[in-house]
Regions:
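Long, mid-chain structured domain cores
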Residues: 77-257
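Long, internal scaffold/assembly segments composed of regular secondary structure
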Residues: 207-338
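Short amphipathic alpha-helical interaction segments
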Residues: 432-445
Length: 468
């Protein structure tokens, strides 16, 4: 295998303009991303809505998993179908229409908020919601085992007569899977492995309400994206399966600046998050090749170099070619020469780090607005769902009582109880770390709820009981 950058692909996909058309001292490309390499489901513009509530995503997530499409959910069209199905007096028919409107519509939008109805959700007006649903399906690796569990849960749902009538009239059918473009690239593998276990447990145990599913998606949206941001900043030295601890505080506890939740949580991650648009563009640049079937990220480049599939020096030379063409096209920034020398795992990794630095440097100096609009799509989700302002200590990842109960249910699953120290390990498998002060307060919380079997003062002999 030989890695080759295709200049014509770059020029076409990045809307390159020659100096015959525009000044050499101007920006002569569009900073394209999400075409040849799909990293995050965001757009670098202010028109694209920010999704902060994962409850909006639940229906589209299930629909995407099942590859299901509903027919038109417009109320006026639905009641015409109902009228053809039901033989009753017109006066009673009008009452039936009113009941359908009350039960299944809110502000003109069809409501699908249980496992029996999710697949019949109409098309969303918010394309950001649809993109996020597809992204989560891809990066959390929804497979046939999960699809089977969803369909089994649907079969067990006790549909009432009115729901059955509406479903019959909406007539949702599976769509043909004719997707030709690649899905989102999975940078961090561990999130999908744990998600599968938790999602199937919830489906099998009846935790299928929209609030529970929203909590699950919020947790794994956080887990995947936070770890991915960190892995990306390690370039070719990143590890797809290695978690970086990110510490949380309990909602009701007081914190100080020297606590892990302040030093080792959002304070660490926020710097990584600021780089995601530059990573998206860099990876798009690296994938301007004649092979559109395989996406290559930083780790994959290093793997191919290490196993001898691609030549290190030749590949590094190709990437330096990308840098030259790219920096030449960004004619309104003149200080690329000030970027310091890089170190890396191999010559290819060094060249990639240098290319990224070129992309990021011009964003923070010339095009900060575009960068911020992209990055804020993720930051605003964190801020709305997971961060709490601790005044002098700043923003800190936060767990509410509801979050704790939910995490504990996922951790214990079908067991009757779990050792307290093992419970903390289960939290960590889902990306949630607590320091010793938080662990002591959490132990007190479980005691107040009568959830703790205290066999001795030793943590090894304390068990948290299953939540019914």
């Amino acid at each position: 295998m030989t890695y080759r950058f295709v200049e014509e692909e770059f020029k076409n996909n990045f809307s390159w303009k020659s100096t015959d058309v525009t000044s050499a001292d101007s920006l002569r490309i569009a900073h394209t991303q999400d075409q040849r390499f799909k990293l995050f489901p965001y757009k670098a513009n202010g028109k694209s809505p920010i999704v902060t509530d994962t409850k909006e995503v639940v229906g589209d997530f299930i629909k995407t998993a099942l590859k299901a499409e509903s027919k038109d959910t417009d109320f006026s069209k639905l009641i015409k179908k109902v009228e053809n199905e039901v033989a009753i007096e017109q006066e009673n028919m009008n009452s039936l229409f009113s009941i359908i409107r009350m039960m299944f519509y809110n502000e003109g939008k069809f409501i699908s908020d249980n496992i029996g109805m999710y697949a019949y959700k109409g098309s969303s007006d918010n394309k950001s919601v649809e993109r996020l649903a597809i992204f989560l399906n891809d990066v959390l690796k929804v497979d046939q085992d999960i699809v089977h569990a969803i369909t089994e849960a649907q079969k067990k749902y006790p549909y009432n007569a009115l729901e059955e009538l509406v479903i019959q009239c909406l007539d949702a059918v599976p769509s043909k899977d004719n997707q030709t473009e690649p899905g989102y690239y999975v940078v961090f593998e561990d999130a999908g492995k744990q998600f599968k276990k938790d999602f199937i447990f919830m489906l099998n145990s009846g935790m299928t309400g929209s609030d529970d599913f929203a909590d699950l998606l919020a947790l794994y949206y956080l887990y995947y994206t936070s770890q991915t941001c960190i892995v990306l900043d390690h370039f070719g030295s990143g590890n797809r399966d290695e978690r970086t601890p990110l510490y949380f505080a309990l909602d009701w506890e007081k914190v100080s600046a020297n606590r892990e939740c302040c030093k080792g949580g959002w304070k660490i991650l926020q710097e990584n998050v600021k780089h995601i648009f530059s990573h998206a563009v860099t990876l798009e640049l690296l994938n301007q090749t004649d092979d559109s079937d395989e996406m290559l990220d930083y780790i994959r480049f290093s793997e191919l170099v290490e196993n001898g599939t691609i030549d290190d020096l030749e590949t590094a030379a190709e990437i330096r070619k990308i840098e030259k063409i790219y920096t030449d096209a960004v004619g309104d920034y003149k200080n690329f020469y000030q970027i310091p020398a890089m170190n890396g795992k191999n010559e290819t990794d060094v060249a990639i780090r240098r290319l990224f630095s070129c992309v990021h440097t011009q964003f923070i100096n010339k095009r900060k607005s575009a960068n911020d609009k992209y990055v804020n799509k993720l930051i605003e989700f964190y801020r709305s769902r997971w961060l709490k302002n601790r005044k002098k200590s700043g923003l800190v990842f936060n767990l509410t009582e509801r979050d704790i109960i939910f995490l504990t249910k996922l951790s214990i699953q079908n067991e009757e109880r779990i050792r307290l120290i093992d419970l903390f390990k289960e939290y960590e498998k889902r990306g949630v770390y607590l320091d010793n002060s938080s662990k002591i307060l959490l132990q007190e919380f479980f005691t107040k709820l009568n959830m703790l079997d205290k066999k001795s003062d030793s943590g090894d002999a304390q068990y948290v009981k299953r939540i019914l």
